[in-house]
């Protein structure tokens, strides 16, 4: 796995990559966070924290936004019953987004990488409720955003580590251990990290 990839035009920016917050991250909202970057260009960047949970459960969220009624809660497919809702970031926190495998496409679906897509409409929630939808998916409320040049500056100031994003790490259910496992996967001993973290 490639680490510490610096954003640049030649490398196509950081679309489809992970950001891992350095231990000295001063913004508590991003402490020990793993962020999946969906869009990164000279106009800025956006992504989702994938290892923080929202207090709301997926079935309750479906009911709150009118996808299902109270009576439907007992007949939800097993997958929908156990799907969790992530805290994607501090921006637009009432808006829902679904990162998913590329076997599901609607008009509003945006490809992020060769095998990951993003859909932010209610159609995909209805598909998951109906027992269909993509094979792999994660739901997030809110997103993380950076102004032009901001993310590049934070990476340069050692606020973030960057690395490739294997699908198993993106979609697996071990949310609490994801940060430590990615550090270990990159061969990083956190006790020996020297940092002067930037701001997120």
Curated annotation (Swiss-Prot):
Q: Which GO terms describe its cellular component?
A: cytosol
Q: Name one Pfam family in it.
A: DUF179
* UniProt xrefs under InterPro entries: AlgH-like
What HAMAP family does the entry give? Answer: UPF0301 (MF_00758)
Give the family, as the similarity comment puts it.
Belongs to the UPF0301 (AlgH) family.
> What's this protein's name?
UPF0301 protein BAB1_0506
